[in-house]
Amino acid sequence: MAVQQNKPTRSKRGMRRSHDALTAPLLSVDKTSGETHLRHHVTADGYYRGRKVINK
């Protein structure tokens, strides 16, 4: 089993954790329906960038 030889410093620990922060999802409002959706995704009613792309 691997065992560390030296204790990692607070600085090294912080540098390792610098990429662990969570980000909120980016939301957009559709031009035609005004519906909120994830960026670069189709809305629930089938619109993407103001165009109907999925027929239900």
UniProtKB/Swiss-Prot annotation:
Is Ribonucleoprotein included in the keywords of this UniProt record? Answer: yes
InterPro entries, sorted: Ribosomal_bL32, Ribosomal_bL32_bact, Ribosomal_zn-bd
Tell me the protein family, please.
Belongs to the bacterial ribosomal protein bL32 family.
Q: Does the keyword Ribonucleoprotein apply?
A: yes
Q: What is this protein called?
A: Large ribosomal subunit protein bL32
Gene Ontology CC terms, in alphabetical order: large ribosomal subunit
- Give the UniProt keywords, A-Z: Ribonucleoprotein, Ribosomal protein
Classification from the root reads: Bacteria, Pseudomonadati, Pseudomonadota, Gammaproteobacteria, Enterobacterales
Superkingdom classification of source: Bacteria
Span-the-membrane segments of this chain are none
Please name the NCBIfam families in this protein's record: rpmF_bact
Q: Which HAMAP family match?
A: Ribosomal_bL32
Which stretches does the entry tag as region Disordered?
1-37
- Which GO MF terms are attached to this record? structural constituent of ribosome
Q: Which GO terms describe its biological process?
A: translation
Give the originating organism: Photorhabdus laumondii subsp. laumondii (strain DSM 15139 / CIP 105565 / TT01)
